[in-house]
A protein has these predicted regions:
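Signature of the first transmembrane helix
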Residues: 2-11, 18-76, 100-118, 169-173, ...
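Interhelical loop/hinge segments that connect adjacent transmembrane helices in multipass membrane
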Residues: 3-18, 187-191, 204-251, 294-309, ...
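Membrane-water interface segments that mark the loop-to-transmembrane alpha-helix transition
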Residues: 5, 20-37, 62, 67-117, ...
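Transmembrane helical elements of multi-pass membrane transporters/channels
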Residues: 25-40, 168, 172, 190-213, ...
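Interfacial segments at transmembrane-helix termini and the short loops linking adjacent helices
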Residues: 53, 116-135, 305, 309-312, ...
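Helix-loop junctions and terminal segments of transmembrane helices
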Residues: 71-89, 154, 273, 277-315, ...
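Membrane-interface junctions at transmembrane-helix termini in multi-pass inner-membrane proteins
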Residues: 80-89, 141-167, 181, 188, ...
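Hydrophobic alpha-helical transmembrane segments
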Residues: 129-136, 162-215, 386-391, 405-428, ...
Length: 466
């Protein structure tokens, strides 16, 4: 046993030392996301005392507008950057995406100027005021960052990207805290910090190497080649972009529904609860996703028979990793939020309880979601995401119709968990894995963990009362 353990450790160390290996790339990316997550969690108690739920709600509305417009403006071509084997086709994809971003900037400037007031009234976000005019610029910078992020992923420059992520987080959080401290928590502090973070990321990625290749983008410019790659990767605007948009919309539905049904304060509570749930997800998932997408694509092209096993191994590891932490936040979320962030945010802790175990399967899905793209089965991803949107809309509408915020969010969390679980099982089925066995094991483990933690909570409550 000791010999086997030693061999396992030595093999792991060897993989970490191997330049360009999956283990080394993951370790580098993980270190960057870990630093960002730790920073985010460390400043959260301060942020909640500088900015109230209403400021967080308006900030969530602004970001929802930016992310939705951004997805449409590039037609979803950026994720295809990994696929071309010839550099000329890759550069043509970059040119296409940048051209779409520039065109969108002009159209947005006109549209947002004409429809500012009706949009703000519909979203009940009049307090954004002049910040609404910043949306086109924020979308443009966001799009360029997406392009450069995909470029770094193609070149496997994970170390440089990890450093950029840390610098961006420090810059954005520092400005947000400073403005909040001086201005008593206006929504402008959150918006200014976020915009500064986007600009910091843009400058850092551009001048960390890509600026030397800008001439290469201009020189081989050809409308014929651009139209050719646009058609070759047409499944991205037809399937990937709608899927990404629906996925984005699925996460933002509470922002729009709760704004109209319960006000921006409720939106702020939801936005803050999900921002903390996203921290561990970003810590693990965002470290895994880019590296694993590159690895899965490479494996399918060279050794397709190995794809099934590497997906299953990663799925199991992520599932086990998230089981207990998200279980704790599910059962003890209201206590944790009240103690750390204050009584004003206790309801946000209740929301995390409704969503906690959905995030277990979201974390595990980082091992399955790339499979649709790798197998070129994006239409199935679109169906799954559309189903997620439908069940979430139904859940929130029921909460609004009954004037019961807690009921709406509880159904939102349960329906999200069910659909995500079914999509994961569908992907494992496509890989010809024993789905029924895997599904039964997952259900038993989740049920046992919840029973144990709820029993512990009842025990603590009993002793506190006594």
């Amino acid at each position: 046993m000791y010999k086997r353990l030693r061999q396992t450790i030595e093999a792991s160390i060897g993989q970490l030392r191997q330049k360009g290996s999956f283990a080394q790339n993951f370790a580098i990316t993980f270190s960057g996301t870990a630093a960002v997550a730790v920073l985010g969690f460390a400043v959260s108690p301060i942020m909640t005392r500088l900015y109230g739920p209403q400021s967080y709600g308006l900030f969530a509305v602004f970001n929802a507008i930016v992310s939705n417009v951004s997805l449409f403006s590039t037609l979803g071509y950026a994720p295809a950057f990994l696929l071309p084997r010839r550099r000329s086709r890759f550069l043509a994809l970059v040119q296409l995406t940048v051209l779409l971003s520039v065109a969108a900037l002009g159209l947005m400037g006109l549209a947002f100027g004409l429809f500012q007031e009706p949009l703000l009234r519909w979203l009940k976000a009049e307090a954004l005021g002049g910040w609404f005019y910043v949306v086109p610029f924020a979308v443009f910078i966001f799009n360029l960052n997406v392009v450069m992020s995909a470029w770094y992923l193609r070149t496997k420059d994970f170390k440089k990207r990890a450093g950029i992520d840390v610098a961006t987080a420090v810059a954005g959080r520092s400005l947000t805290l400073g403005v909040g401290w001086l201005g008593n928590g206006p929504v402008g502090g959150l918006l200014l910090g976020d915009l500064f973070a986007k600009l910091t990321m843009f400058g850092s990625m551009l001048f960390s190497g890509i600026h030397r290749q800008l001439g290469e983008i201009r020189r081989p410019f050809s409308w014929v080649r651009i139209k050719a790659v646009a058609w070759q990767y047409r499944e991205y605007p037809f399937y990937v972009m709608p899927t990404a948009y629906l996925s984005n919309l699925a996460g933002q539905l509470p922002i729009f529904f709760l704004t109209t049904g319960f006000g921006t304060g409720a939106v702020g509570l939801y936005a803050f609860s999900t921002s903390l749930l996203e921290l561990p997800l970003n810590l693990i998932g965002n470290a895994v996703a880019p590296v694993f997408l590159q690895k899965a694509t490479e494996t399918y092209q060279q050794e397709p028979e190995r794809l099934r096993q590497i997906c299953l191994d990663l799925y199991n590891r992520l599932f086990y990793l998230g089981l207990l932490p998200f279980g704790v936040i599910t059962v003890f979320g209201d206590w944790i939020f009240r103690f750390i962030f204050g009584a004003e945010w206790e309801q946000a802790g209740v929301f995390t309880g409704y969503l906690g175990y959905y995030y277990v399967f979201r974390l595990a899905s980082y091992a399955t979601s790339p499979v649709y793209a790798v197998l070129r089965r994006q239409q199935l991803a679109l169906v799954g995401t559309a189903l997620l949107v439908l069940v979430r809309v139904a859940s929130l509408l029921l909460g609004i119709r009954t004037h019961n915020l807690n009921l709406g969010m509880l159904l939102f969390g349960l329906s999200s968990l069910l659909v995500t679980f079914l999509v994961d099982m569908n992907i494992l089925y496509l890989l010809k894995l024993p789905v029924l066995k895997l599904a039964a094991r997952s259900i038993v483990l989740v049920g046992a963990t919840l029973a144990l933690l709820w029993g512990l909570r009842r025990l603590v409550e009993h002793f506190l009362v006594v």
